[in-house]
Each structure stands twice: as structure tokens, then as C-alpha cells.
Amino acid sequence: MEHSLNSLNNFDFLARSFARMHAEGRPVDILAVTGNMDEEHRTWFCARYAWYCQQMMQTRELELEH
């Protein structure tokens, strides 16, 4: 269980990092990033990546408003 939780923490860190890169305008090939993941991890990772992208874009929009 601890190994699985550690893996999810690592995947979450990577999803957040790639979302930050995307928000900065740097190219992110999400298919290359998730290419070796099994379907369960790929689905989870892509959902977290999309959530972080949305959060970072909302933050960026708020910063531009002020």
C-alpha cells in the first residue's frame, strides 16, 4: 500500500510539473509522457494533469485581471 501511495505522489508531482510547463507555454507531449503507463495509471495521470492545467490557467487569468 505504501509503495502504491508513493507512486501516486510521484505521478501527482509529475502531472503538476508538466501542467506548469504547459502553462508557461512549453511544449508537453502527454502521449509520450504516459506511453509506458498502464491504462489505470494513464487515466488517473491524465485527469490530474488536466485538473492542474485548469487550475494554473485560472490562476494565470486572475493574475492578469489584477
Curated annotation (Swiss-Prot):
<dbReference type="Pfam" id="PF08971">
    <property type="entry name" value="GlgS"/>
</dbReference>
<comment type="similarity">
    <text>Belongs to the GlgS family.</text>
</comment>
<protein>
    <recommendedName>
        <fullName>Surface composition regulator</fullName>
    </recommendedName>
</protein>
<dbReference type="GO" id="GO:1900191">
    <property type="term" value="P:negative regulation of single-species biofilm formation"/>
</dbReference>
<dbReference type="InterPro" id="IPR036295">
    <property type="entry name" value="GlgS_sf"/>
</dbReference>
<dbReference type="InterPro" id="IPR015065">
    <property type="entry name" value="GlgS"/>
</dbReference>
<comment type="function">
    <text>Major determinant of cell surface composition. Negatively regulates motility, adhesion and synthesis of biofilm exopolysaccharides.</text>
</comment>
<dbReference type="GO" id="GO:1902201">
    <property type="term" value="P:negative regulation of bacterial-type flagellum-dependent cell motility"/>
</dbReference>
